[in-house]
Amino acid sequence: GAVYLYNIGNLQCPNAVLQHMSIPQFLGEGTPVVFVRKSESDYGDVVRVMTVVYIKFFVKTTKLCVDQTVWKVNDEQLVVTGGKVGNENDIFKIMKTDLVTPGGSKYVYKLLHCPSHLGCKNIAGNFKNGYPRLVTVDDDKDFIPFVFIKA
């Protein structure tokens, strides 16, 4: 399912990265994201697999929350916003998988969180406090499959 930005806990700025699922209360449209490449030598409209990227929600926001759209992983290993482009701890990569969609598409990917001082960890899904959250996991076989759609 699509990912979206949501406010859990009545914060000033929404910071939860959630996943729509095939469960009626969690169906819906996603929030568009932008992949910001770390290296200026990566140019063009295509983000290649295993390229270092920062992930940023492409959403209208208030002045107060303008810096709260970049993804990061918090101390609970949850994917949230509040990261910074250029911060070595907020790096992600996209990796191709061998999965095929029911429609036959072979363009199925997984996301990895790859802080500079540690190895990469898969992004998987988990319910936390009743919400479908994105989390980092150590198991290479546990991940959410993503299909990217140009917004």
UniProtKB/Swiss-Prot annotation:
Q: Which Gene3D superfamilies match?
A: 2.80.10.50
In which domain of life is the source organism classified?
Answer: Eukaryota
Q: Which GO terms describe its molecular function?
A: cysteine-type endopeptidase inhibitor activity
User: Keywords, A to Z?
Assistant: Disulfide bond, Protease inhibitor, Thiol protease inhibitor, Vacuole
Tell whether Coiled coil is among the UniProt keywords.
Answer: no
Localization recorded for this chain is: Vacuole
Cellular component GO terms, alphabetically?
A: vacuole
Kindly list the cysteine pairs connected by disulfide bridges.
13-65, 114-120
Q: What does this protein do?
A: Inhibitor of cysteine proteases. May protect the plant by inhibiting proteases of invading organisms.
Q: Which family does it belong to?
A: Belongs to the protease inhibitor I3 (leguminous Kunitz-type inhibitor) family.
Give the protein name, as stated in the record.
Cysteine protease inhibitor 5
> Which organism does this sequence originate in?
Solanum tuberosum (Potato)
